[in-house]
C-alpha cells in the first residue's frame, strides 16, 4: 500500500499533507513531520540531470534529503545525524521573509549591472539574453540583509550550539547567480579551504524557491565516510604547486591557474557507482537550511529553465579556537589569487 500511494501522490501533495498534520504519525513511512526521506518513491519525480548526465532514478541510487525539522532544537541528535549523514537539512528553519529580503537586495544589484531582463519583475531573476552571470562574490560585500542573515542571528546561533563553543566564520561569501546550463561538478570542499581546521562546515543557502528544474544542491549519501576512496584527493590544495616544476610555476604563479581544479569527476553517475549510496536532493524553499562537512561529496543539478537564475551562497563556519585558512579572512581575503598560492618542493 505505501508504494502504491506514493506512486499516485505527487511529492508536493505529500509535503502539503505533512504541513497540515505535522504531529500526526501516519501509517505510511514517507509521511511524518515532513521527513519524506528514503521510503518515498522516486517514480513521481522528474528526470534529474547533473553536469549534462541523467541520473539513475532508481530508489537505491537516488533519494530525498533527510529533513531534520523534527530535531531542530536537539543538538545532541543533530550531531548524531551529522556524523551519520554528513549533512543536516532543516526545512523552513530560517525566517522566509529575511531570506527574501536578502534576495531582493541581490537581484537589485544584478539589475543595476544590467544582468536581469527589464520585461520581468526583478524578484523573478530572469536573465537578459547574453548577460554575464555566474559567480558573484563581490555582490555579497556590503549587502546588509545577506550579511545579517548569514553572520548573525539564527545561522550563527546554530553553529554556536552545534560546536558548543564560540565560533567564527570566513570573511568571504561565495555568492552565485547561475543561469541555464550545467551545474557544479562532484567535489569536496576541503581542497579549496584546508589550510586550517578540517572540522569547519559549509552552509548552502537558497535565496528563493529552487525546483528540480532550476537545480539545487545534491549530496552523495555516505560519501564522507569513504576516506579509502578520497585519501588521494581530499588533502590536496588547489593553490599548491611544485616550485621545482617549471610547468606548474607557469600555470599557477604566472598564469594564476590551479595545479589541479579540485574536481572529483565530470560524471556524477560514475561517482555514485564508485562510492555507492544515493544522490540526494530536494526542492528547496527560501528559509531552508543545509549544512555539511568538508569530506562530503556534493554537486548541483543543472539549471534546465529557459532564462531563470538560481541564486545561492556558500558560507563557512568553524570553532573559534581552531586554526583558520588564511585565504578566506580579512577585509579583502586573498582567496585563490596570487597571495593565496603556496609553493612546495616536490
Residues of each region from the PLM?
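Non-heme Fe(II)-dependent double-stranded beta-helix
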Residues: 41-85, 91-186, 192-195, 334-346
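Cationic, low-complexity basic patches in intrinsically disordered or flexible, solvent-exposed regions
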Residues: 20
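Catalytic core of non-heme Fe(II) oxygenases with the double-stranded beta-helix
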Residues: 157, 182-281, 322-329
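Extreme N-terminal basic, low-complexity initiation segments
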Residues: 1-9
